[in-house]
């Protein structure tokens, strides 16, 4: 029995990467009875039949999983936003951060296209960078050519996804990370049958000692399962202060003696972050129930 990681799922086959090789595997029939559906990113136990084929015997417990794109065991999410074209939006950034925080995945902010920004725009981005770093987020600021070595070092030994709205430079970042790995990935590319006209599915691509999920279309924000009471846990700077609130169930909105609101008034929490928290909180409260 071998252990490996699913790096692609297509037409009932699961491509498992183990010890430098890729095996085309099927899942055992009892998976359906147990209501288990293997995902890209799953760590699995499998048995080989020959040099290229095998059967998945078991799926290890998951650290986390996204629904769209369907990927499991993600260590970090690289959230790409552009400084300009389109302009950087803290509202959009905070919404992406909430979507990732609620899945217990470490978010990393990457601000692209700095070479196209004016001096005043660069100064404003620097202010935002300081604010997000003070919260505890890692922030990369890149030009047209991303600092791929720094990002590759960051990804090393991890499984990452890249997300962001269209036009912000996700493809540029992904291609720059993958450009010098042609020889390393030749075997995997051949095994997966990648080509110019191959239909794009979620798959993990080796980047140094880590993997990056090539997730076409990962630009939407979903929080159907997020409850108003748990939103504050997606804002680390608020979670750190909630013990100072007078009321145990304080949601930092209309309650008196709120430590979070006091921190906002003292400029210890960015006003725009609190504003976005309240906006999202109201959206969650006003959300129509699903049956």
Curated annotation (Swiss-Prot):
<keyword id="KW-0547">Nucleotide-binding</keyword>
<feature type="binding site">
    <location>
        <position position="252"/>
    </location>
    <ligand>
        <name>Zn(2+)</name>
    </ligand>
</feature>
<dbReference type="InterPro" id="IPR027417">
    <property type="entry name" value="P-loop_NTPase"/>
</dbReference>
<dbReference type="InterPro" id="IPR030378">
    <property type="entry name" value="G_CP_dom"/>
</dbReference>
<protein>
    <recommendedName>
        <fullName>Small ribosomal subunit biogenesis GTPase RsgA 1</fullName>
        <ecNumber>3.6.1.-</ecNumber>
    </recommendedName>
</protein>
<dbReference type="InterPro" id="IPR031944">
    <property type="entry name" value="RsgA_N"/>
</dbReference>
<keyword id="KW-0690">Ribosome biogenesis</keyword>
<feature type="binding site">
    <location>
        <position position="245"/>
    </location>
    <ligand>
        <name>Zn(2+)</name>
    </ligand>
</feature>
<feature type="binding site">
    <location>
        <position position="258"/>
    </location>
    <ligand>
        <name>Zn(2+)</name>
    </ligand>
</feature>
<comment type="similarity">
    <text>Belongs to the TRAFAC class YlqF/YawG GTPase family. RsgA subfamily.</text>
</comment>
<keyword id="KW-0378">Hydrolase</keyword>
<keyword id="KW-0342">GTP-binding</keyword>
<feature type="binding site">
    <location>
        <begin position="112"/>
        <end position="115"/>
    </location>
    <ligand>
        <name>GTP</name>
    </ligand>
</feature>
<comment type="subunit">
    <text>Monomer. Associates with 30S ribosomal subunit, binds 16S rRNA.</text>
</comment>
<feature type="binding site">
    <location>
        <begin position="164"/>
        <end position="172"/>
    </location>
    <ligand>
        <name>GTP</name>
    </ligand>
</feature>
<dbReference type="Pfam" id="PF16745">
    <property type="entry name" value="RsgA_N"/>
</dbReference>
<dbReference type="Pfam" id="PF03193">
    <property type="entry name" value="RsgA_GTPase"/>
</dbReference>
<comment type="function">
    <text>One of several proteins that assist in the late maturation steps of the functional core of the 30S ribosomal subunit. Helps release RbfA from mature subunits. May play a role in the assembly of ribosomal proteins into the subunit. Circularly permuted GTPase that catalyzes slow GTP hydrolysis, GTPase activity is stimulated by the 30S ribosomal subunit.</text>
</comment>
<dbReference type="InterPro" id="IPR012340">
    <property type="entry name" value="NA-bd_OB-fold"/>
</dbReference>
<dbReference type="GO" id="GO:0005525">
    <property type="term" value="F:GTP binding"/>
</dbReference>
<dbReference type="InterPro" id="IPR010914">
    <property type="entry name" value="RsgA_GTPase_dom"/>
</dbReference>
<dbReference type="GO" id="GO:0019843">
    <property type="term" value="F:rRNA binding"/>
</dbReference>
<keyword id="KW-0479">Metal-binding</keyword>
<dbReference type="InterPro" id="IPR004881">
    <property type="entry name" value="Ribosome_biogen_GTPase_RsgA"/>
</dbReference>
<dbReference type="GO" id="GO:0005737">
    <property type="term" value="C:cytoplasm"/>
</dbReference>
<keyword id="KW-0862">Zinc</keyword>
<feature type="domain" description="CP-type G">
    <location>
        <begin position="63"/>
        <end position="221"/>
    </location>
</feature>
<dbReference type="GO" id="GO:0003924">
    <property type="term" value="F:GTPase activity"/>
</dbReference>
<keyword id="KW-0699">rRNA-binding</keyword>
<feature type="binding site">
    <location>
        <position position="250"/>
    </location>
    <ligand>
        <name>Zn(2+)</name>
    </ligand>
</feature>
<dbReference type="GO" id="GO:0042274">
    <property type="term" value="P:ribosomal small subunit biogenesis"/>
</dbReference>
<keyword id="KW-0963">Cytoplasm</keyword>
<dbReference type="GO" id="GO:0046872">
    <property type="term" value="F:metal ion binding"/>
</dbReference>
<keyword id="KW-0694">RNA-binding</keyword>
